[in-house]
């Protein structure tokens, strides 16, 4: 079983894309600092009231545009603020019992990054040139994005650079990392980097973005603690949308297998996908959250999903804006449109917090048709929860413990 520090047993994350949340300009046009992180700080109490114990941040390092085109790993993006702003947010989160996770974009950098500029100036056969990947004099890029230049992960100097970055921010007080596009990096790279980080910070939690593949083998080979459970994400929304719980049952069977090897990172929304409420409606989104709250793993709630925000992922410039929205200045400025969904999230996450063993839960199907699914979720030695999902006439959820209803979507 992959490593899991004790504090992660209770981790429920509020996943935020900072540049969108605070309404930062789309591109970094100057180095003038705008102190926008205070905007996010005003929402920390909301995260706590929601039932979360962690703030999972998208990119905060200086970048050319969307945060995944890093310019400087040791500098806070001026559109968000400066070191003092970040330290204040970190301290405020910790004071509320919220751990803080950062997004480490170590597969690629901006074409404007000093690493790339030095490589181009010095040539591919130089020490600087070997920091990035190239072929026949052309820089390798990430998934066809010409502005995203791939780092050369076979180079020990790149391993040392990434290790230094991770240790630096852990030293600043960060509790964990999401490794962006971890699926594009040879697991041997992570296996070389992560032990040096854990040697100094043994309680750090590190999970990778992995979409396809043998999750358990990737975790084992890389030394990462966990990976994102995209198979389950697909199984949840697709089974509700198509009214086919056989797909969810299959996904939960796979989830049980993965959970024998590591503790998966679970979610129904993130900064890269169409909003769950846009896929399955508001009631369907609550049903999806009920699944998330009652299965094994470490759940992440994407900001706005708890308020029934909608947004569709598109393939064009600026296509992510709809799913990475600006939030109001404070919770007091919210409308009442998402109030019912918020209350449902709070009560479901409260249920999960009262049953901390759910992090290790396994599910078992009790009754299965296309439109109705009943499963048992539990661990040895505890009273299990019985979860009933029904999409025959709308979407409804009933959760029982020892024969008593402990949560109902109609309550």
Give residue ranges: language-model regions.
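Active-site beta-loop-alpha junctions enriched in small/polar residues
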Residues: 19, 60, 105-107, 182-184, ...
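Active-site-proximal helices and loops of the catalytic beta/alpha 8
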Residues: 91-96, 164-165, 180-260, 264, ...
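Short catalytic-loop micro-motif centered on adjacent basic/acidic residues
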Residues: 101, 176-182, 275-277
């Amino acid at each position: 079983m992959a490593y899991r520090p004790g504090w992660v047993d209770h981790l429920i994350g509020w996943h935020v894309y900072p540049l969108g949340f605070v309404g930062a300009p789309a591109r970094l046009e100057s180095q003038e600092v705008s102190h926008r992180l205070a905007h996010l700080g005003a929402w920390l109490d909301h995260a706590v009231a929601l039932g979360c114990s962690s703030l999972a941040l998208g990119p905060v390092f200086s970048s050319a545009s969307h945060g995944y085109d890093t310019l400087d790993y040791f500098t806070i993006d001026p559109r968000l603020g400066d070191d003092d702003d970040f330290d204040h947010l970190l301290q405020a989160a910790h004071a509320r019992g919220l751990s803080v996770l950062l997004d480490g974009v170590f597969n690629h950098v901006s074409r404007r990054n000093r690493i790339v500029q030095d490589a181009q100036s010095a040539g591919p056969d130089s020490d600087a040139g070997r920091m990035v990947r190239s072929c026949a004099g052309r820089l390798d890029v990430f998934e066809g994005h010409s502005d995203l230049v791939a780092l050369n992960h076979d180079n020990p100097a790149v391993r040392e650079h990434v290790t230094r970055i991770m240790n630096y921010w852990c030293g600043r007080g960060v509790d964990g990392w999401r490794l962006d596009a971890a699926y594009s990096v040879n697991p041997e790279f992570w296996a070389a980097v992560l032990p040096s980080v854990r040697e100094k910070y043994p309680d750090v939690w590190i999970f990778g973005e992995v979409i396809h593949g043998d999750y358990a083998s990737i975790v084992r080979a890389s030394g990462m603690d966990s990976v994102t459970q995209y198979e389950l994400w697909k199984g949840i929304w697709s089974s509700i949308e198509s009214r086919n719980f056989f797909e969810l049952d299959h996904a939960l069977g796979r989830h049980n297998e993965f959970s024998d090897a590591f503790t998966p990172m679970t979610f129904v929304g993130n900064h890269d996908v169409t909003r769950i409420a846009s896929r399955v409606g508001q009631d369907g989104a609550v049903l999806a959250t009920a699944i998330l709250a009652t299965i094994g793993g470490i759940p992440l709630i994407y900001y706005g999903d708890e308020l029934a925000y909608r947004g569709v992922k598109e393939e064009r410039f600026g296509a992510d804006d709809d799913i990475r929205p600006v939030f109001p200045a404070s919770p007091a400025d919210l409308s009442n449109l998402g109030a019912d969904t918020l209350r449902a999230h709070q009560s479901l996450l409260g249920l999960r917090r009262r049953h901390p063993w759910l992090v290790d839960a396994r599910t078992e199907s009790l009754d299965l048709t296309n439109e109705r699914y009943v499963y048992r979720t539990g661990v040895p030695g505890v009273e299990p929860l019985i979860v009933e999902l029904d999409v025959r006439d709308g979407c409804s959820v009933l959760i029982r413990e020892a024969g008593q209803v402990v949560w109902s979507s109609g309550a």
